[in-house]
């Protein structure tokens, strides 16, 4: 197998999620809007075919992938292939149930944890993925077992006021990496209380969008890397 450099395959194994974040869309990262989970046999075929074509890096996402019954078996299956690596995108739901298999393959696995802010509510808007005590304990358990953890923070005008403090707490107190993400522009969002589509979705995006350039000075202050190393050319 000729390995493809810097190429990975993202697989949304389920559209089910235990959270309903206002900035997300139906199905999460899946292109499907139906409530469904890909069968384990189908996922194995996808992985085997991808590996045969030079892909050895896999990102497992959803929905919430840790809610899928075959999650543990999936990790074991991917690790059977030589030189594979796995990134798991999760909100932390049930992740500690799999601590043994994650620790077993910790050299080849990293966890991307969605954590958006310090407070559960900002301006009356619910943020399910906040830095709760439970999230802190899960993070510490993963790091205690030497498992790589990164927080993904989706920045909006609502939580922008807490992002800097969250970043510093994550790095200094919890020993995790952090990635700031701007708000994806979708044609639909789950919304604050009801789903919004079309022009309403665009209006919501405009209302909430924050350019990453707002954080460049802050990142320069706390990072030992140059701007070219921690950002793209897109502002």
Each predicted region: which residue ranges?
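Canonical Radical SAM [4Fe-4S] cluster-binding loop centered on the CxxxCxxC motif
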Residues: 2-41
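Hydrophobic faces of well-ordered beta-strands that scaffold small-molecule active sites
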Residues: 7-11, 58-60, 86-88, 111-113, ...
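Canonical radical SAM enzyme core domain
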Residues: 31-45, 65-107, 114-122, 127-134, ...
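Hydrophobic positions in alpha-helices of CheY-like receiver
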Residues: 50, 74, 78, 102, ...
């Amino acid at each position: 197998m000729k390995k493809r450099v810097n190429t990975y395959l993202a697989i949304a194994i389920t559209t089910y999620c235990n959270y309903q974040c206002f900035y997300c869309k139906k199905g999460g990262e899946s292109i499907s809007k139906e409530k469904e989970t890909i069968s384990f046999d189908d996922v194995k075929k996808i992985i085997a075919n991808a590996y045969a074509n030079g892909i050895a890096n896999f990102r497992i996402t959803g929905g919430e992938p840790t809610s899928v019954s075959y999650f543990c078996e999936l990790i074991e299956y991917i690790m059977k292939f030589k030189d594979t690596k796995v990134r798991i995108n999760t909100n932390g739901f049930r992740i500690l149930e799999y601590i043994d298999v994650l620790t077993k393959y910790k050299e080849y696995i990293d966890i991307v944890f969605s954590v958006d802010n310090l407070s559960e509510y900002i301006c009356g808007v619910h943020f399910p993925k906040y830095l709760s005590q439970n999230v802190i304990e899960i993070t510490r358990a993963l790091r205690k077992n030497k498992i790589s953890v990164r927080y993904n923070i989706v920045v909006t005008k609502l939580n922008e006021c807490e992002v800097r403090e969250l970043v510093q707490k994550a790095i200094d107190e919890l020993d995790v990496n952090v990635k700031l993400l701007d708000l994806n522009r979708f044609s639909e969002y789950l919304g604050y209380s009801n789903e919004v589509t079309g022009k309403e979705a665009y209006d919501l995006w405009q209302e909430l969008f924050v350019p990453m350039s707002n954080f460049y000075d802050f990142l320069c202050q706390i990072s030992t890397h140059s701007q070219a190393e921690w950002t793209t050319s897109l502002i």
